[in-house]
Design a protein with these regions (language model features):
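Buried hydrophobic positions in well-ordered alpha/beta secondary-structure cores of metabolic enzymes
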Residues: 58-61, 114, 180, 222, ...
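Glycine-rich phosphate/nucleotide-binding loop
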Residues: 92-95, 278-378
Length: 406
């Protein structure tokens, strides 16, 4: 891969082996954005120089980012790459230091990077509804600044953790769903406000707004992924009530009929989807939906594997750096205790390697290491029953690092 900022260096070797998807998810080549060049050539071992921005954020964010940083450094050392890391503030800590949830310096660093790894933002300290700004505003703004319109959340059950799920093994075993959540439209970005009424009451409103092009691009992206997976796409809406959902349904139907006729395509109302995720999650392959519906459904689905601490996500646009993060929150109740599960952030780092840097073998190495650690019986506190032994944040990462070279 050629990087206009620093460049690839290629050398002949025999170390490249066939690549397999350890966790069963990947992006289609047609939209896996690798803005700095072209895919690696079979038979070449290529050295990459890349700039990676770390955004630790709040709560347990700094702890899990620190461990993912260790893993990325190990990848660079093991495969001969050169990763340049820089750390910047976002969220509550940024509000405390600058008064803004996303300082200009952070935005500039992210735009100049090849990829971004985020910890978590928010916490009770900044929960004042009357505050000028909130930590979550930093996340919304960075998505907008970078043009990130698609959030990918893989929901994959690990065989080793099936008994950790609140659902029965026979319901969740084999679950492998890839959610595509639209990020730039809908209720979170439409017109909103608070009005004072003559009788002393207040009236609040939030408006869901979508354009044809916003729906088209996310549906196409999801469809390309379906072609690379099990060839099935489900679109979730509320078209029986909402006009914005009716637009989604019309546009999606046209795109699928005209451009992806070989894909098995269906639509499900959001309330039904919430039930289906708990009763028959293995029925779904790729799911595409709007901003708020995706936000809620993916949080629900995140409990299928047994813990939020196991699930990564990626936010991607048409070009430029992607943003990678665990889907769990800042968990301020355990911050600083050294017990946070870093595996979701480590898996997010693997997604970063694959989708922003084009390093498939390296990503698979990280994912395989995590899987071996779980197979060996190592667990963090969120993955065990009360009273059972568990490992801390650093210790579980130590095992991942050992497994990578073992």
């Amino acid at each position: 891969m050629f990087n206009p900022r620093s460049g690839w260096r290629a050398k002949s070797c025999t170390c490249c082996v066939p690549i397999f998807q350890v966790l069963g998810y990947h992006l289609a080549d047609s939209f896996a954005k690798r803005p700095r060049g072209t895919p690696r050539r079979p038979g070449d071992c290529l050295t990459l120089q890349a700039k990676i921005v770390l955004l630790p954020g709040d709560g347990i964010g700094p702890e899990v980012i620190r461990q993912a940083h260790r893993v990325l450094e190990a990848v660079a050392s093991q495969f001969g790459h050169q990763f340049e890391f820089s750390e910047h503030i976002i969220g509550g800590i940024a509000i405390d230091k600058t008064g803004e949830a996303l300082p200009d310096a952070t935005t500039a660093a992210c735009k100049a990077s090849d990829a971004i790894l985020l910890g978590a933002v928010g916490g009770p300290k900044w929960d004042d509804p009357n505050a000028k700004t909130r930590p979550e505003a930093g996340l919304l703004k960075i998505r907008k600044e970078l043009g990130l319109f698609a959030n990918l959340r893989p929901i994959v059950t690990f065989e080793e953790l099936l008994d950790s799920s609140p659902l029965k093994r026979e319901i969740i075993e084999g679950t492998d769903i890839l959610f595509f959540r639209e990020l730039t439209g809908g209720l979170y970005f439409g017109p909103s406000g608070l009005e004072e009424l003559p009788d002393g009451q207040q009236r609040a409103y939030s408006t869901a707004v979508y354009t044809t092009s916003e729906v088209e691009r996310i549906v196409r992206m999801a469809a390309h992924a379906a072609l690379k997976r099990r060839n099935k796409l489900t679109m979730v809406d509320k078209a029986n009530v909402l006009e914005a959902s009716r637009l989604w349904r019309r546009v999606s139907a046209r795109i699928m009929k005209e451009e992806f006729p070989t894909i098995s395509y269906d639509v499900v109302l959001v309330d039904s989807m919430a039930m289906h995720l708990l009763s028959r999650p293995t029925s779904f392959d790729v799911v595409v939906t709007s901003n708020m519906f995706g936000d809620i459904l993916t949080d629900e689905a995140s409990m299928l594997p047994g813990s939020l601490g196991m699930l990564p996500s990626a936010s991607l646009g048409s070009s430029g750096p992607g943003l990678y993060e665990p889907i769990h929150g800042s968990a301020p109740d355990i911050a600083g205790k050294g017990i946070a599960n870093p595996l979701a952030t480590i898996l997010a780092a693997a997604m970063l390697l694959r989708h922003s840097l084009g390093l498939e073998k390296e990503a698979a190495t990280v994912e395989a290491a995590v899987k071996r650690v779980l197979a060996a019986g190592y667990r963090t506190a969120d993955l065990v029953r009360r009273g059972e032994p568990s490992l801390g944040t650093v210790a579980i990462t130590d095992h991942v690092l050992q497994s990578m070279v073992g």
